[in-house]
Amino acid sequence: MSLAAVIVLSPVLLAIALAIRIEDGGPVLYKAQRVGRYGKPVTVYKFRSMRLHADRLEDMLTPEELAEYHKNYKLTSDPRVTKVGALLRKTSLDELPQLFNILMGQLSLVGPRPVLQEETELYGDKRSLLLSCKPGLTGLWQSRGRSNVTYENGRRQEMELRYVRERSLWLDFKILLWTVKAVVRMDGAR
């Protein structure tokens, strides 16, 4: 299924790659280290949506922005995001290269969000439960909450762990439908 999606979406993938390249001339893809199933490291691919060297947080963010980032691993209004990147994020098209992660067997189509090592600590004694499941391109959090649901009040953890506990083919099907709806409506997109 992922191979078919890559083939069908290849004109879109190429157009996005060209837009990124034209905007600032940098690399098209961003490689992010995430934690996969059983805690194994996974390199997740995304279309680059930020300016070059955006990982140098201290150089690019104000102290207030840094505090917000370290609290939620996200910023409400991130000054590092490019114009093309903002559109890609709003439409979730920045995630399309993860189809290659699915082809390589590193991600599943549906599962908990692939997270940073530091984020796994926010799951406390449920960390091993989270990591017992292969991360996915989409999941309960992405389809039902996204940026509107954070770690701060524990709701994001609840959603991700609920998926792991209740996963089934039927739930995956519902999540795929909810994902299409969320992407089309840009629910929780930033």
Regions found by a protein language model. Name each.
Residues 27-28, 38, 87, 107, ...:
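Gly/Ser/Thr-rich beta-alpha loop segments that engage phosphate groups in nucleotides
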Residues 30-79, 138-159:
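Short, glycine-rich, amphipathic interfacial segments at transmembrane boundaries or analogous
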Residues 16, 30-31, 59, 110-112, ...:
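Short, hydrophobic secondary-structure boundary micro-motifs
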